[in-house]
Amino acid sequence: MHNPQHYMTGFGNEFATEAVAGSLPVGQNSPQRVAHGLYAEQLSGTAFTAPRGENRRSWLYRIRPAAVHGRFSLIEQSRLHNDFGGGPVPPDQMRWSPLPLPATPTDFVDGLYTMAGNGSPEAMTGVAVHLYAANASMHGRFFYNADGELLLVPQLGRLRVCTELGVLELEPQQVGVIPRGVRFRVELLDSAARGYVCENFGGLLRLPDLGPIGANGLANPRDFETPRAAFEQRDGAFELVAKFQGDLWRADIDHSPLDVVAWHGNYAPYRYDLRRFNTIGSISFDHPDPSIFTVLTSPSDTHGTANMDFAIFPPRWLVAQHTFRPPWFHRNVASEFMGLVHGVYDAKAEGFAPGGASLHNCMSGHGPDAATFDKASQADLTRPDVIAETMAFMFETRAVLRPTQQALSAAHRQADYQQCWSGLRAAFQHPPAKNTTSVLR
């Protein structure tokens, strides 16, 4: 693709970029004749009438319009879908070892594997959670998702995501967001790649409100990076793959759709380095709620309740006094899907490996394992706990995450996960009877 890789900084900004000078019209969006023989095309990510502060759209100036391709036909496959219904959902806590890497050549699209989800794209609420494992770049094919925006969380291997609006290079401990409808190709920069994907059907991801934290903190807007315009002009026999209403569809296309020479607007891919997250924590006592670790949030129609929150558990110092410092035992009205990008998660001493995943659905008890509890209960609190070399994350949703059948029956599901709490014994010592006010019998 033409143009060396550079980025523009800021979250949700109104950007303007061109790979060929003079391609952007001045003072209007759709001139009678666009410079250099390009076509003008608007890409809308929200309704035309959405409030200005929430309105997302970009104008693209491209070699051919997006409408130029063949007729779509259904791809028969069962790994990637929106089928979260039919059948009971067990309330068990669940954990999976890393998704095995493929033994045969597999690109990003073929390597997607649906784990769980809720809601639907037609209802414009909910999410789908996928894993990916690939060992080949996408050759001669391009992909777009009409169902939702994609939050990519690499765990193994670097990715070069070539999109209509420019190139995102991602490595583990960075995340990327591909807006709904944007066409792209994923190239592997290493021999294999694995990671996590949250497909957001609901309100577009945004930065959380900071409240009393103030004007700064958590993920700062200036650290988000959006690519500058880059394009390729290639003719040939290519394949365009679309995810639409939970199914994959393919169409022939005789040129690369990554042919946007210039664009302006605020609906575009972006990336963020999780190592730049400004972590907030207690410097007195107790462990604050994990909402303090929110990087991005998708709002719902209920004020104060997210459709989905993306939170991380990065390196940090724990200094709270008179306090059990690891994450506490918890039952949550929300549902939590966790993954581990790097290192060890401080609430699980064993069994939760990078590339692995866990699901704690609504009101399923969870928390530190027995080894972590015993260690933290006896820790010397005069010294800080330096949590280093780690990066865990969570997709938290207001609706139950319904695991797919392939996730429930997967060979890499850990059937003995509940045993991590089996060592938590009753240590209660009954005080003298005179100090007891009420006992159930």
Curated annotation (Swiss-Prot):
GO function terms (MF aspect): homogentisate 1,2-dioxygenase activity; iron ion binding
SUPFAM superfamilies per UniProt: RmlC-like cupins
Gene Ontology annotations of biological process type: L-phenylalanine catabolic process; tyrosine catabolic process
This protein's UniProt keywords: Dioxygenase, Iron, Metal-binding, Oxidoreductase, Phenylalanine catabolism, Tyrosine catabolism
Regions that span the bilayer: none
A GO cellular component entry from the record: cytoplasm
Alphabetized Pfam families for the sequence: HgmA_C (PF04209), HgmA_N (PF20510)
Cofactor(s) annotated in UniProt: Fe cation
Enzyme type, top EC level: oxidoreductase
Disulfide bond positions: none
Record bears the keyword Cell division: no
Record field: catalytic activity: homogentisate + O2 = 4-maleylacetoacetate + H(+)
EC number: 1.13.11.5
Pathway: Amino-acid degradation; L-phenylalanine degradation; acetoacetate and fumarate from L-phenylalanine: step 4/6
Binding annotation for Fe cation: 330, 336, 366
List of catalytic residues: 287
Residues holding homogentisate: 345, 366
Function recorded in the entry: Involved in the catabolism of homogentisate (2,5-dihydroxyphenylacetate or 2,5-OH-PhAc), a central intermediate in the degradation of phenylalanine and tyrosine. Catalyzes the oxidative ring cleavage of the aromatic ring of homogentisate to yield maleylacetoacetate.
Classification via NCBIfam families: hmgA
Family in the record: Belongs to the homogentisate dioxygenase family.
Subunit organization: Hexamer; dimer of trimers.
Name of the featured protein: Homogentisate 1,2-dioxygenase
Organism: Xanthomonas oryzae pv. oryzae (strain KACC10331 / KXO85)
Organismal lineage: Bacteria, Pseudomonadati, Pseudomonadota, Gammaproteobacteria, Lysobacterales
